[in-house]
A protein has these predicted regions:
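Short, solvent-exposed loop/turn segments at secondary-structure junctions
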Residues: 68-71, 154-156
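Active-site-facing substrate-recognition patch
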Residues: 1-57, 61, 96-119, 129, ...
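A structural micro-motif
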Residues: 61, 90-91, 118, 145-147
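A short, conserved beta-to-alpha structural element at the edge of catalytic cores
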Residues: 97-98, 137-157
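Short, glycine/charge-rich flexible loops or terminal/linker lids adjacent to PRPP-binding catalytic cores
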Residues: 71-121, 128-136
Length: 157
């Protein structure tokens, strides 16, 4: 049973579905298991519907992820966000932002593929410090976007 958690970290509020890890698996194991993509989608879509609304429409809402730093192909978070977007009927904007460094804390993101929709769901698969979410918040707010932050796993107790 999902246990939602609203967390404020790095001056950003986000909703997470799981705390720490799923079934005692490491984050690397979770990302390597292709079936976990659909598991995340199936688990997160009802939560998004309940938190944001059941009548999310294309033209008003979009979904993005935080910048990809390591796995540019078959990126776990991007695959989940794209599946969520398809299920909800809203566009997924691939590569919304770029990060010039691999640093997570204090990162500054550059715009790349900013949604035209006014409301944006920012999805991140795993959150630890919240710095990545803060950088996305700063970027999207500069572009006058309303943001809702949804994460799969809150990786910090």
């Amino acid at each position: 049973t999902p246990k939602l958690r609203l967390t404020r970290r790095a001056s950003t509020n986000f909703i997470s579905l799981w705390q720490k890890s799923i079934f005692g698996r490491t984050l690397t194991e979770i990302k390597a298991d292709g079936s976990m993509v659909q598991f995340f989608i199936d688990s997160l879509v009802p939560i998004i519907n309940e938190c944001v609304g059941y009548h999310i429409s294309s033209g008003n809402w979009a979904i993005v992820t935080t910048p990809m730093r390591r796995h540019r192909e078959h990126n776990f978070a991007s695959r989940i966000a794209e599946g969520i977007g398809n299920t909800l009927g809203i566009p997924f904007y691939f590569d919304c932002a770029h990060c010039q460094s691999k640093q997570r804390v204090g990162a500054v993101f550059l715009p790349n593929n900013i949604p035209t929709e006014p409301n944006v769901i920012v999805f991140d698969d795993f959150v630890t410090t919240g710095s990545t979410l803060l950088a996305m918040k700063n970027l999207l707010h500069e572009h006058q976007k309303n943001t809702v932050f949804i994460t799969g796993i809150n990786n910090k107790l």
